[in-house]
Amino acid sequence: MGVNTTLNCGACAATLIRPIGPPHAEGPRRIVAVSGGIGSGKSSVTRVLASLGAVTADADAIARQILEPGEPTLGEVARAFGDDLLREDGSLDRALLASRVFGGEGSDERVARLNAITHPVIEARAWSILRAAPQGSLAVYDIPLLVEGDHADRFDAVVIVDAPIEVRVQRLEGRGVAPEDARARIRAQASSEERRAIATIWIDNEGSADDLEEVVRLVYERWLTPDVPTFD
């Protein structure tokens, strides 16, 4: 059997760059990170893996949960960036927080300050989900800031999802993010080169949703769940 380290589906492609860790005898079969810059499509990859049976922990979803009214983390963020971030009903004005943290002079320091408050709480909740995954299952951590947190070595495989910057900006515009804000958020995150340095599997996501779903299904079936990855 020949070895082919790339899977192509339309305009999407997955490349196996480094060996995948062996399956665990107890607990989840493998614990895998899915990461990528904002607008890359990493959440879509995670959704496909979940539909195939993976247990998932979503850092972005947890980040939203810990900033809901009544959560201690919300109070810490308000103390750090201004009590006016809280509406009369106690909820967070997320748009105001984003405008205050991202972009402009000193944004790196502000982003680091926000991350220092939220990331430890997100990590603790996520890993409680991953470690509780059923015996033999695939556990997936959807985490945007994997490079920035220097956590890649904790996973059996790291799946990086990438797309050209302008494609990502267009996707964010579709979510109501202004182009200049989208570019500021992208600049505040790790570069594609930094992500490639830690990738086990690299997914180029320039195609359709169907292309992406098919390439992720192949990655799941051929690389992430077998004892040893299979190649055609």
Residue ranges, per PLM feature:
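Walker A (P-loop) phosphate-binding motif
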Residues: R18-A54, A59-A61
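ATP-dependent small-molecule kinase phosphotransfer cores
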Residues: A61-L138
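Small-molecule kinase domains that catalyze NTP-dependent phosphoryl transfer to phosphate-bearing small molecules
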Residues: A152-R154, Q170-D232
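Well-ordered beta-strand positions
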Residues: V55, A61, A157, T200-I201
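C-terminal accessory "lid"/substrate-recognition subdomains
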Residues: G2-P19, E26, W127-L130, P134, ...
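ATP-dependent NMP and nucleoside kinases share a basic, alpha-helical "lid"
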Residues: E76, A124-A133, L138-G174
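Hydrophobic "anchor" residues on beta-strands that sit immediately upstream
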Residues: I31, A54-T56, L138, A152, ...
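A general structural signal for well-ordered alpha-helical segments in protein cores
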Residues: I31, T46, A59, L74-A78, ...
